[in-house]
Amino acid sequence: MARRCEVTGRGTVSGNNVSHSHIKTRRTWKVNLIKKRIFLEDENRWVTIRLSTRALRTLRKKGIKAAIKDNGGSLGVLAPKKYAGITKQAPKKA
């Protein structure tokens, strides 16, 4: 699973550290992600999504569905996970 916000699509970006002598070295900036349980009132259920703290502010201001639509995302993020709670198991040997 990529380190990407499911609401805004923000992910890891890369760039340069620049020293005093202008020597450039590559580095990455990682997005501040959290797992958050959100209650969908119209569907009467909880969903767990990974979102950035910036998206959490937007979510509190606008609401979950409006925040996803405004960022060009899909409401499929809120769909129930087909295999939630099921772990992959190796086939049993006879």
From Swiss-Prot:
Keyword Ribosomal protein attached = yes
**Domain of life of the source:** Bacteria
Please give the family membership noted in the entry.
Belongs to the bacterial ribosomal protein bL28 family.
**NCBIfam families of this UniProt entry?**
L28
Q: Where is the composition biased (Polar residues)?
A: 11-20
By its UniProt entry, which SUPFAM superfamilies does this protein fall under? L28p-like
Starting at the broadest rank, the lineage of the source organism is: Bacteria, Pseudomonadati, Spirochaetota, Spirochaetia, Leptospirales
- Gene Ontology BP terms: translation
Q: What is this protein called?
A: Large ribosomal subunit protein bL28
Query: Pfam family of this protein, just one?
Result: Ribosomal_L28
Species of provenance? Leptospira interrogans serogroup Icterohaemorrhagiae serovar Lai (strain 56601)
Output the Gene3D superfamilies linked to this UniProt entry.
Ribosomal protein L28/L24
Q: Which UniProt keywords apply?
A: Ribonucleoprotein, Ribosomal protein
